[in-house]
Amino acid sequence: MNKSASIKENINDERINKLNFWLRSMSDFEDADIKQVSGDASFRRYFRVRKDSLSFIAMDSPPEKENCGSFLKVANFLDHMSVNAPRIIESNIEEGFLLLSDLGSQNYLDVLIQSPESAKDLYEDAIKSLHKIQYYGKTFQTELPPYDEKLLKEELSIFYEWLCSRHIGLKFGNDDMKKWLQCCDELISNALKQPKVFVHRDFHSRNLMKTKKNNPGIVDFQDAVEGPITYDIVSLLRDCYISWPETKVQ
């Protein structure tokens, strides 16, 4: 969601008013230009904050809906790994506000659609960053929630409950449901047998930003877990937003 107008006081949006007050209470941002740049599938919203030639991102994460602390925690982990993730400039955990460094507005998906020939270089950079996360993440992964059997079952259930049942109206009969549950058991068993690493959990083209230095910038990492080593690389190469010929994936 892109907004062209600067954010001002809004009698219908208490969160915007609080964010405005918090940002403008800092001497460096009293007269900053603040514009909403996006929202995501959660309750979080993001705003670009410009002051002179500098640009930052403010994150609004309502504390009753989202865990701002998990973003802060994982961001610090990634910073220690020298991975290109947003740095925390200022934080107000109680209110659910963070001020972050700005990684720009070009995500991998947009670049790949416009310039498919850039795929090789972009994916090589992404895989190098993923290797850093898995290698240096050994120090931090046990501090993350486990991607255990319970969580795997919950996420697999989304396929049937939301896609099959609600979205396309497909109801499984007894035989189909039995086969589906057997498939889930096999997938869960396979995942639990794999070596455990630091898992981003949404490592795909919309969460990777093309940057001039230390490409890619990595965002939307707050749901990181300790889980199977193949999870993130499959998210990247079997991206739900863009598909590649099998020969290219291999």
Pin down the residues of each PLM region.
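An alpha-helical support segment within catalytic cores of ATP-dependent transferases
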Residues: 19, 25, 138-145, 150-151, ...
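ATP-binding pocket architecture of kinase catalytic cores
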Residues: 47-149, 153-154, 168, 192-193
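Active-site activation/catalytic loop segments of kinase-like enzymes and analogous catalytic loops
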Residues: 158-167, 230-250
